[in-house]
């Protein structure tokens, strides 16, 4: 995400005809188990080489640092596309497993064993210059073409044994000389293994003319980091200055890139093979990938509903207990309010959601302090008598409709504070399982005010001057930015 400024909304605003496909570019290694064994051995070696002296830990790095670095970086990129609904499910499984503590170190990792277990419905290609076939070139080029070819053929056959004809060798076109050495070796290995090829373009921005935006955005990421100060001339000023073009291309544009870069690098290819690889890319998208959508159905836990009961019945029972506990069962206004709220909750099918939130709240209270709740959930009498919140909405004149409307389709937010969120998360995982408890992910966007200041810093504009005009710039730029980027 750090250098990615392309998404479907921008593609649509540019008037592009395209088909979005669910997939990932994963970090792949041959064997997570073997990698872990080697890594643990390196860590043991490092530990044994540390010597205590003068209250300092002195380390002899000469025999371990390079080896450790190689092990940490022993990974390759792999493009994995979901072919159908089953494939999407398997893709989710792979991503989840790659983030498991057993497979995660700095990066999520997956290996042949994981791919074999969840291969159904997936299409895989060998990715870019950081892919597994490219690694065969980088790791063996000093030993000659024969060694490179053997490694590539072995790797292709290993993937074919898992995915069959759903594995593709991937070609890319740019002005980097090594890319063409890799391409030639991939073409040779694909011929030996009867593996189909695709031509692809790494895509990081929507149109050719927006490369400056991406390059500037990339440089902003280094502001304040331990990198040398960048001057304005670090940014490429012309498309011709780029070693590679990172925007989506149609078939004609891919062919043009191939012809231009192969001529520029003085490399001869079989035109028919390349033309077929471009067509194959189209076939994958429009013939091999089904039209499907992620199943966004919310699946709440069943254990909150006792055997022989329904979610509605259990919610009624708990609310009745809560009314009696607080002494509200004899107060007509409270009884009427609880009936109204329960009717809305049941009509929307949210009973199990409230039972789940009560279960989480109850578990939290066993180990730590829990706040009274905040936000519109404080307007729910049901939440109060269940013990989810600690505020009586009738006492303070709080409206249930601010929390949950009769026509609501999404679950309402119920926010409450706990003294130790991480401890609660660990407790819930231990009680209910790591496959059923996940934190919420947040994606933050750059705000215009901070973006103006970062860009000004990059160009060396004094902050006092920037502050004088920031408000005016925001007022003038916001409408245009929203129109351009959504």
List each model region and its residues:
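Alpha-helical scaffold/interaction cores of sigma-54-like transcription cofactors
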Residues: 1-486
